[in-house]
Amino acid sequence: LSGFVIGYAYDDRWGRMTYRDFFKRRLIRLHPMVVMGMLIGAAAFYFGAGGPYEMIAGVPVGRMLLILLLGCLMIPVPPSMDIRGWSETYPLDGPAWSLFFEYIANICYALVLRRLSKLLLGALAVVAACFTVRLAVTQGDMIGGWALDGEQLGVGFTRLAYPFIA
C-alpha cells in the first residue's frame, strides 16, 4: 500500500520538486517515528533487565547509547553488536526494520520506479508476487527481515517488493 500512497502523493509533483525536496519530505514524515521508537525502546530496555531478557543486565550503558544513536540514524546493527540476543538490526525498536525497508523503497521509487512504464511496473509486480509466493511456500510463513544477514535481508526485500510495487 505504501507504494500506491507514495505514487499518489508525489507522481504529479516531480515537475516542481527535486530529489532533495522529496527525501526531505519523506524524512520529515517517517523519521520522528524512528527516533521516538528508539527512545521508548531504550528506556524500556534500560529498565527491563531480567526475566526473559537476562542478557540486558550485562550490557554497558555506553553500548546501549551507541545502539540508540545508530538506531536514530537508521544504521542497521550487525549481529556482532546485538544487545538482546535476537540478532535484530534495531534491538531497541524491533519493528524499525520495516521502516528501514520503507526508506529503501522510497529511494527506489524516487530514482527508478516512478520513471517506469505501467507495463514494466506490472511485470515487476508479477515477478515480486512470484518471489512472495515462493517465500511463503518454501518457508511456510512470511516471518523475517529483521536481521542483517543474507537470508533475512532476502525475506525483508521480498516482503517489501510486492506490496510496494503492486
Q: At which residue positions do the language-model features occur?
A:
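Transmembrane alpha-helical segments and their boundary/interface "anchor" motifs
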Residues: 10-70, 105-106
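Hydrophobic cores of alpha-helical transmembrane segments in multi-pass inner/ER membrane proteins
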Residues: 1-4, 37, 162-166
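Hydrophobic alpha-helical transmembrane segments of multipass integral membrane proteins
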Residues: 3, 39, 129-132
